[in-house]
C-alpha cells in the first residue's frame, strides 16, 4: 500500500493554480480584481504575446507595506477577511488569498509597491513560488505586478493553450466585463504596444458601454431600474432591434462582480417577451446590489458562479424592470439613420424586404434583378445631407458621451460611412430551428445540398396570391401552391452558392468606404479569422480602435447589401468558430439567401410573381428551400374532385369509413 505524504508547498500551489489560473486571462482577472479591492482609480494592463510572455498590471491603489509584501504570495494569506463571519458578508472581489500564490508558483513574478504613509517602496522578485530577493526601491504609491514566462514550469498547461489571438480575445473580454462592473475606474488595456481598450472612469455606465461596444451601440441602450427590500437592479439593455447571435453580450454583475447564471439569463429574455427573434440575444449590462448574506460567492474557484437566496424574486424583478422600460420606449426603428444615404439614391428604394404589420406591394425591377417597394409620394421635399449643419447622424449620448478619436481619423470621418446593422434582425424567423452552431446538423444539410440532382419543373400559369404569402398557379397536372419566401430563398441560394463558391476576384472600389465597429474581443477574433472573409471576397482592414474599414466589395454583392451583409458574415463567423472554407461558404450562402428573400405579407404584382416562378423553374432543385422545407405543394385534378366528393372510389359511405 502506498504511503500517504504531505505534498510540498510549491507542488500544492501548482495544483491549486490549475483551478484558479486556467489561462493568461485568469491572471489578468485576479490581479485586476486585487487592484480594484485596493481602491484603485486608474488601472493599466500591458500584455505581450497574449500574456504568455508578459503581463503587467499597474494601479494607483493603496499599495502594500514592506512587512505585508512577502505575505502576499503565501497561500490563504489575505487582508480581506479575518474570521468565519466575514465569509458571509464579502464585499470585495477577492478574499481567499489564492491568486498571487497560484500565479507565483507557475511564473516569474515581480511586485513593486508603495503606500502613502511610507517614504519608500518595496520590490519583491519570486520564481516558481520561491522568493529570490526583496529590496527597498523608489516607486509611486500603488502597485505594479509583472508576470513573465507564465506556465514555464507546467508544460502540459502551456501545450493546450489556444492561438495567441484567441487568448488575447479572452483577456479583452475579462477587461471589458471588469470595466462594466466598475465604471468609476479608468481602465487601459495595451497589447503589444497597441491600445485595445480605454475607459474614462467617470462612473457613467453608459459612457463605459460606449467605450467598449461603440457609440452607435450605446445610443440604442435604454436604462432599467427596479428594487425591492432585498435587491436593487439597475443597468442598460439594448432595444429589440439591436441583437447578437449569442449570449456573450449579456453581462450580469452582483455587487460589481461578473457572474454567470442561467436563470438570470432566462429572466432577461423573459423581460423582452416576444420582441426578440428566435436565436437572437440582446446586449445587456445589469448590476444587482444585494446584501452579501443573500449571495454565496464561495462555491467555485473562479467565483463566477454564485448561489443566490430568493432567486425567483430576483428573476421577477429583472423581467419586470426590462418589460417596463421597453414598454415606455418607441420601438419603431429610427428611419433617420439611413435618411442621408437614401436621398443620394434614386427615388425608387431597393431594400431587403421586411415583415410589416400590413402587407406592402412588391415590384420587380428586371435591370436590378430584385424586388423593391415604391416609396409613397411626399407633399414636401426633404433634403438632408451628411454635411448639413442642421442634421447630425451621430449625437452625444445623453449629452455626456463624447467620441474619442484621433485627429487624423476625425478629419477622415467625412469621407467614410459608419456602417449600421440591419434592423430586420428581429423580424419573425422563417426558420426558427436553423442552428449554425449545430455542427453535425449543418454538415448533414450541406452534404444533402451538395448531392442535389437537377430536376425538371412543370410549366405553371400564375393566377393569384393569398395573404401576401402563397402564390397560386395551375399546370397540366393540377393546382400548385407556392411559398413565395421559400421559392425566392431557393433562387437566391443557388445564386449565392455559385457566386461565393467561385469567388470572383473582381472587386468594385467603393466611392465612400464603410467603417464597421465591433467589441474588442470580436475585433481580435475576426482578425484571426480574416482569411475566411478574404476567401469570399471581403477584405477588411484595421482602422482605429476595434474598427475595420472596407474600401472595396465583391461584384456579386450589391452595394445596398454591404452594411448588413458584412455584419451578417462576421456574426456567423464568430458564431460558428472553427469551420473550413468550404463549410463557411456553404453556410454563408444559406444564411444570405434566407435574409435576402421576400418574407410573408408582401403582395406581388403579376409580373413579379411570374418572374419568380420563371426563376424557380431554372433552379437545380426547385422543390425545396436550402433548409429542406417544401417550396410548393401539388393538388391533382383527382385530388380536387375527391375533396369536393365529385368522385368516390366506391359507393361505400365516407361517414361509415370514419372519414367524416
Swiss-Prot record:
CDD domains for this protein: HATPase_MutL-MLH-PMS-like, MutL_Trans
Chain segments carrying region Disordered: 408-436
Gene Ontology biological process terms, A to Z: mismatch repair
Determine if Signal is one of this entry's keywords. Answer: no
Bias (Polar residues) ranges: 425-436
Cellular component (GO) terms are: mismatch repair complex
Question: Entry's Pfam families?
Answer: DNA_mis_repair, HATPase_c_3, MutL_C
Top-level division of the source organism's lineage = Bacteria
GO MF terms listed in the record are:
ATP binding; ATP hydrolysis activity; ATP-dependent DNA damage sensor activity; mismatched DNA binding
Q: Per UniProt, which keywords does this protein have?
A: DNA damage, DNA repair
Protein's UniProt keywords contain tRNA processing: no
What PROSITE patterns does the annotation carry?
Answer: DNA_MISMATCH_REPAIR_1
Question: Which family, according to UniProt?
Answer: Belongs to the DNA mismatch repair MutL/HexB family.
Q: So what does this one do?
A: This protein is involved in the repair of mismatches in DNA. It is required for dam-dependent methyl-directed DNA mismatch repair. May act as a 'molecular matchmaker', a protein that promotes the formation of a stable complex between two or more DNA-binding proteins in an ATP-dependent manner without itself being part of a final effector complex.
What name does UniProt use for this protein? DNA mismatch repair protein MutL
UniProt source species: Streptococcus uberis (strain ATCC BAA-854 / 0140J)
